[in-house]
Amino acid sequence: MKKNLTELVFILDRSGSMGGLEQDTIGGFNAMLTRQKEQEGEANVTTILFDHEVQLLHDRFPLHAVAPLTEKDYYVRGCTALLDAIGYGVEKMVNIQRHLPADERAEKVIFVITTDGLENASKRFGYEKIRRMIEREKERYGWEFLFLGANMDAVQEAARFGIGADRAVRFENDAQGVAVNYHVVSETVCRMRQADCPASIGAEWKEEIEADFKKRHQE
C-alpha cells in the first residue's frame, strides 16, 4: 500500500428537506476541504451527492486540486436514495482498491456519510446488502465509516447497515448544527489521517455534536 495516502469519500444529502441550508452546507464543506489541505500526507477526494438520484461530483480528485463547492454543484431536490449512494460509493472504492497495484493502494479509506432523513428512494441497494459490504471492508481492510444523521436515531439507523455506535451521531439540522458537524468531521478526519491506527480513535470524536444537540433540546 502507499503510505500516507488516504481515500476520502464524502456522501452528502441534497434532498429537498435540506432546503434553506444550502449555503451552510457549502460553507462547511469548503472549510473542511481547506483544513484537510493543511494536513501532511496525500489524499484523494470522492464526493457523491444524492437525492432520488446519485451524482458523482469528485472522482478521486487529488485533494489539492478540488475546487470549492458552489451552488451550481449543491442544490436541493427530490427524495432520499441514501442506500444507493452508500452502495455506489463502497462499490466504486472496492473496485479501485482491488485493481490498483499493491504499492498504489491507499493506506486508509474514510467514508463520511451525512443525511437529514431516512432512506426512501433507493432502487439498487437494500440494508442487508449494504451491511455486508461495509462490514467486509471494515473487518478485512480497516476502512472507516462515519455516519451523521438528523431527524432520526442515527445510532440505530447506522446499525442497520453495519456502522457501529461509536461512529454514528445525531445532529441538529440547522445552521449551527451543520457548522458544528463540519468542524467536528474535519478535525476527526485529520486525526484519522494522521493516526497509525484510525480504529484507535474512540467515540469521543462526536462529543461536541452530541453536546450541541442536547443543549438545544434542553432550552
Question: Locations of the language-model features?
Answer:
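Acidic, low-complexity intrinsically disordered regions
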Residues: 1-219
